[in-house]
Amino acid sequence: MDSVKEYLATPYGIMLNAPSYTVPDDDIGFITRVYPGVKENGAIFSHPNPWAWAAECVLGRGNRAMEYYNSLCPYNQNDMIEIREAEPYSYCQFIMGKDHTAYGRARHPFKTGSGGWSYFSATRYMFGIRPDFDELD
């Protein structure tokens, strides 16, 4: 998780990989044919970001989990709407990564499972509310 902080964390969320692929490579696959900083090739894919929040909580680093939460939270990007270009209440499928000229621009609102994963990670790991069959742990 230290490498996530060092290489992948951005003000808009955590990128999938860095640097982006810039040359097609059939041995690696389709990801190398996607524009750098877009979708699977170096973008900030919203869906797995909440997994990093949970991981940081498990490691006892709640402040870092909150930092990552705040970076992806749509509401916290209201002051950057000219860059974001998406609704301030919607998680988007991805946000353009550092290797794209439109870095920070959000795309495909509502086309993601990020809302569910965000709720799961925030309630169970950040808040510590863990339902069991008979009770809350």
Regions picked out by a protein language model, each given a short descriptive name:
Residues 1:
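His/Glu-based metal-binding/catalytic segments typifying zinc-dependent metallopeptidases
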Residues 6-10, 21-25, 34-41, 51-137:
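Non-catalytic C-terminal accessory modules of carbohydrate-active enzymes
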Residues 11-15, 44-49:
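Generic helix N-cap/helix-start motif at coil->alpha-helix transitions
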